């Protein structure tokens, strides 16, 4: 009897591991709301664009992220203060609380909205967690897919 229970418990554990929910992302802290979409955004070499009204510290955080992605992906990303409809787009949304951000990832663009440096930093940290762990490396990482799952 004990052996049957033990085998059933092991089988249940194995089955539950195999039925992971693909409608989530693995980030900490987990966002208040996430809607996973089909497809992905190719981050390697994507341009980084920011609204001209962003403060210098926020622009520097964006430039640092672009530089790190360029380094590890081996594909250069440009950074500018021009309006854009493709690539990484960082805009100011003063209606959001200081540490809040919104992140909308489509196949053509990643739109980040925040009202402060803290919000932009948290959004960047979320995106880094969605990329391969090699995003934190110090050299080009061969054979990695630098994509972000489409979500909002």
PLM features per residue range, with description:
Residues 17-152:
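Acidic, contiguous N-terminal accessory segments
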Residues 1-26:
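Bacterial Sec-dependent N-terminal signal peptides
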């Amino acid at each position: 009897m004990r052996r049957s229970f033990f085998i059933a418990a092991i089988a249940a554990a194995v089955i539950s591991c195999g039925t992971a929910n693909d409608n989530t992302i693995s980030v900490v802290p987990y966002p208040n709301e996430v809607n996973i979409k089909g497809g992905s955004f190719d981050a390697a070499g994507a341009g980084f664009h920011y609204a001209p009204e962003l403060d210098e510290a926020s622009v520097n955080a964006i430039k640092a992220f672009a530089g790190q992605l360029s380094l590890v992906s081996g594909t250069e990303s440009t950074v500018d203060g021009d309006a854009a409809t493709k690539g990484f787009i960082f805009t100011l949304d003063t209606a959001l609380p200081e540490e809040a951000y919104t992140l909308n990832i489509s196949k053509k663009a990643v739109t980040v909205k925040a009202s402060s440096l803290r919000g932009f930093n948290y959004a960047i940290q979320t995106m880094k967690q969605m990329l391969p762990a090699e995003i934190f490396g110090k050299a080009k990482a061969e054979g990695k897919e630098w994509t972000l799952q489409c979500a909002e």
